[in-house]
Amino acid sequence: MENGNKALSIEQMYQKKSQLEHILLRPDSYIGSVEFTKELMWVYDNSQNRMVQKEISFVPGLYKIFDEILVNAADNKQRDKSMNTIKIDIDPERNMVSVWNNGQGIPVTMHKEQKMYVPTMIFGHLLTSSNYNDDEKKVTGGRNGYGAKLCNIFSTSFTVETATREYKKSFKQTWGNNMGKASDVQIKDFNGTDYTRITFSPDLAKFKMDRLDEDIVALMSRRAYDVAASSKGVSVFLNGNKLGVRNFKDYIDLHIKNTDDDSGPPIKIVHEVANERWEVACCPSDRGFQQVSFVNSIATYKGGRHVDHVVDNLIKQLLEVLKKKNKGGINIKPFQVRNHLWVFVNCLIENPTFDSQTKENMTLQQKGFGSKCTLSEKFINNMSKSGIVESVLAWAKFKAQNDIAKTGGRKSSKIKGIPKLEDANEAGGKNSIKCTLILTEGDSAKSLAVSGLGVIGRDLYGVFPLRGKLLNVREANFKQLSENAEINNLCKIIGLQYKKKYLTEDDLKTLRYGKVMIMTDQDQDGSHIKGLLINFIHTNWPELLRLPFLEEFITPIVKATKKNEELSFYSLPEFEEWKNDTANHHTYNIKYYKGLGTSTSKEAKEYFQDMDRHRILFKYDGSVDDESIVMAFSKKHIESRKVWLTNHMDEVKRRKELGLPERYLYTKGTKSITYADFINLELVLFSNADNERSIPSLVDGLKPGQRKVMFTCFKRNDKREVKVAQLSGSVAEMSAYHHGEVSLQMTIVNLAQNFVGANNINLLEPRGQFGTRLSGGKDCASARYIFTIMSPLTRLIYHPLDDPLLDYQVDDGQKIEPLWYLPIIPMVLVNGAEGIGTGWSTKISNYNPREIMKNLRKMINGQEPSVMHPWYKNFLGRMEYVSDGRYIQTGNIQILSGNRLEISELPVGVWTQNYKENVLEPLSNGTEKVKGIISEYREYHTDTTVRFVISFAPGEFERIHAEEGGFYRVFKLTTTLSTNQMHAFDQNNCLRRFPTAIDILKEYYKLRREYYARRRDFLVGQLTAQADRLSDQARFILEKCEKKLVVENKQRKAMCDELLKRGYRPDPVKEWQRRIKMEDAEQADEEDEEEEEAAPSVSSKAKKEKEVDPEKAFKKLTDVKKFDYLLGMSMWMLTEEKKNELLKQRDTKLSELESLRKKTPEMLWLDDLDALESKLNEVEEKERAEEQGINLKTAKALKGQKSASAKGRKVKSMGGGAGAGDVFPDPDGEPVEFKITEEIIKKMAAAAKVAQAAKEPKKPKEPKEPKVKKEPKGKQIKAEPDASGDEVDEFDAMVEGGSKTSPKAKKAVVKKEPGEKKPRQKKENGGGLKQSKIDFSKAKAKKSDDDVEEVTPRAERPGRRQASKKIDYSSLFSDEEEDGGNVGSDDDGNASDDDSPKRPAKRGREDESSGGAKKKAPPKKRRAVIESDDDDIEIDEDDDDDSDFNC
């Protein structure tokens, strides 16, 4: 052939080898490589007495032949459980290895078919094995019939010794020359203990070695430890020394020792013997995924499906833990958790398969394992506490920071893909530091700015509109930041880079814009947007605020014009000062600018022409600025924010008392302001307004949006029902509402809702589908299709006679709603309230209006009021007072025949549909962890009643019934309620905490009594003036008819003088009105009046008359006008009929006046209470009659259907009076009583104590009320409603207690609270609707009222703080635990007029309702857990987060 090579013959080219020759020729197919390999391996280090991982050089083939012998020895343990010893001797000097084990020996007998001894056959002949029967399930390492023969083949000497007592013989034979030669068999009699020994000398030449070096000996030694760990009950000796590894746990410790750092805590190992075939351990890994695993004593270095089986199960459960703790919102994937695990697995697998003879990777499918590894809940819990969760989250945070850094901007002359950006021509170029980016509040403001660019040019100025309020990035997580398009766009437009510091002006040159100018409305929400932008920059680039980088552009909020004179005012206090100093201010035309959109393009150009006046620089003034920004926006500074707001309210009150003007920022000479001044003088106004929107007034129980609705309804005084959509438009018009009408519609709907858990007294009547307890009001119809009208009770509560006494506000010259109305009972207790503002939140339960009236009568009579408990109209469950303002509430359960259960009431705030989906469905269908216990459940409820009839799977009824409190626990029908979070604004507009409902009642009583005195005085004056007027008119007519008085053909002055001479008075009614105005004006000077946001808010009459002196104004009236009430009468008045009518009217007024003078203010109040209670009885009686009438018709109709269907076919029934269509509870049912044990009370107190400590670590706790003695049951219950439209039905906090069946149904009761003397008796007049209460935490969303934004339609309302989340059913109590009321959750989304219970409003500007940053999902609540011997008590603890600044 070519190159002179001799051609090979056919015989030389195609050869046949024996199997022995093939093994020696191609060893890598059988034992792996025979070349030296460098790998990172675990080896045993004698000097350190532990496993070390290091790079060693070894021959895999040599290692494998040793391992085959060792695994054979370990396999013997599976054949003979009495085996307990393995002895391994490694002699590098003699190149000899020996493995000895006791236990059953190899049969020393002749094989009848092969005609040789069994040991000779299995060690000296290929393809022989005891593992060929696949029908036999074995958990040994041998499988293919090579094993020990391979060791024989690659050895120069291979000796087998075995002895068996069964055959009474011992065997010995030696092979040499790579199994090519065999010595004669030596057979001896034997009567000792069975054993087997293999001794071999590896053929080092085959492995290109000359001796057994240190690395291979270390690796072999490690395998000795492996076998000691993976072979239970076997002692392993190495070179005569017994190894100190007693079990798998000891073996793991040898590895962990190597990773412990003396300077830090030791690594926590979590170990578990899952079952007899699986033993698992795990710990955190900082080197990526690591595993040490064994299958039937075989070391699987590369892992395999047995490892995947364990790891996948572990990761799945750890991900659930991570989801709860992953506040960063990062999407953590399974492989990312895997990278933080170090797993140890020792398992026995039936007939395992591997990807090669080297057996490094187990490939058998999981279904063939013969067993499963199920990790216990304890193992998962311990793993979650081992540091693995923290490691994964820390890595996720680190990765998120790197990912966020990549999203930053860079300097470039042109950027694309950002809609609505008007980029400066020089942005990103050489003159970029001279460029200014104008950030506007919405598109309308952008139009204004673009108009201004016509004056200043577009080379150095760019404009970008914001879509609402920016995200509060200070506590934002990765997901929020990465998905927030607006923040990413800002970084790109400005060129900001995360993690970069901007310290000098040279650093500013790296940006696309050298300045940012904020241009927002001059209202409180505009201030909030400025603050959020400042916070955004301060959080990421605090050094940037120290440079002249940030500016604001201010515009007038009021303009006063007169002829050619135009005055601009940039704050309302400045405008008020000007009015006080300008006598002729009323001659000016006043125009209020509610937003930038009010200004015209011409005005925009005027603003930009006077840039020096309108541009204000933010100036850094040291650490006080940093501290102020952090205080305003950090979640950790809630208490500081409370102090900040309290100081602001005190300062406003003090300045009022001293007659000082309000402080304001923007004077005529203002060129710059500090960040601290902005926070303390401007942003504080938004925070205070946010509280006013979110927290009701103690006086009338209303929030501003609700008050605007009621003002409009009173003003319209409709006699016919009006469509809700039309009413909302009317509210916006009449009450100067400046935001979208959708939130008003929601407010109207919620004022009219009357299902269980909503209002105890609905002020508006629902005409149409306003929502039901089926879905908590979310099932209401569109505002276009439903109608409403004032309830007949409303004007009895908010009495028209009080209207003249109220202080009405003025907005843009328009008289709008008063600061507060003055109901005759405290409506804040009747209908309760919930809201989350800045620094504070409130939760006031509903109380029984009849109890409230009863207590008011007691107080009027000088007695102390009785303790009141929460009460919810038409709620049939029960509630018991425990201690410290906490109640335990339950639904109703009855046992029916046939071991069936009936649920006839749910906790307040638990809606029927949600309960079915979240509780009954899982109990019926089962979950991943728990099998279903219900075989069937049937529904018989309506929109107002609840009835589920439940059948159980075999044995489940008895099991649950035998458990104390079992039914209530399983069906999640018991929760707790706290009344320790009651905040409200008092009559002076100061935010206060009220420890109990009685404190609210007493505070209300003082004010209401004072105003009854004012009402009496007012009415006395009014009736006196009216009587005087009628008397003069009647006398005038008589004297005129009798010719005593002649007015014809006289001059006006002479005529008026004649009237005065004859004792006629100038118009008594006008004179009385003038006196009232003068008194109001004087009082306004002397007393501390309430503050107002937009215009003077003390009495409008007082303020206006203060500006125009009523005394002077009256004197200016001509005499004729003063006597117009006489001289202006028509000729018809001179008739006898009219004369008699006037006299009758006069006598009636005098009679009314006499009657009024005989009454005290207290008597007037009692009359009003009697009238209200009478009407309340009438209304509720009518409601009951209508409901019973409907139910009766329904029952009759369904009974007829049932009879008709029964004639034709057999109707399947669950028996025992639970017929189809029966909406009423079964009268034969046996009620299940819930028993509150001392243990439950102690657990509640302990859990509440921990929760309080977690919330307020530095604040002293409120004093606890004395313990309550248990009283006999039978009293009327009170319960708290959950009139939530968008509740999250949290069944994750349930009371575990005792329950037992009682022989009779018991009335709902409330346990006595300290101080109550007598049990309250149920009134016959309807006051005693059977009551109880359940509060599913977060389920009840009481009136959340805000005036600043528009809410999305009801269908899917985004939750601000508690967005819908997966319900956890594991805990014991669901209690807000809001002791001290210092939850302080500020919610930025809380700016809507939607007063639906716990339905947070969506934050957004009216004209940009579709924009804005995405809302953060309600953060999950922390849990305070008290560990006990029995169970854990868990209480949901409000996360003190300032949502107000966490958009």
Swiss-Prot record:
Residues 1413-1423 have a biased composition (Basic residues). GO terms for cellular component: chromosome; cytoplasm; nucleus. PROSITE patterns: TOPO_IIA, TOPOISOMERASE_II, TOPRIM. Belongs to the type II topoisomerase family. Control of topological states of DNA by transient breakage and subsequent rejoining of DNA strands. Topoisomerase II makes double-strand breaks. Essential during mitosis and meiosis for proper segregation of daughter chromosomes. During meiosis, it disrupts heterochromatic connections between achiasmate and chiasmate homologs after spindle assembly so that chromosomes can separate at prometaphase I. During mitosis, it functions in the separation of sister chromatids by establishing amphitelic kinetochore attachments in mitotic spindles. Eukaryotic topoisomerase I and II can relax both negative and positive supercoils, whereas prokaryotic enzymes relax only negative supercoils. This is DNA topoisomerase 2. It comes from Drosophila melanogaster. The lineage of its organism: Eukaryota, Metazoa, Ecdysozoa, Arthropoda, Hexapoda. The gene is Top2.
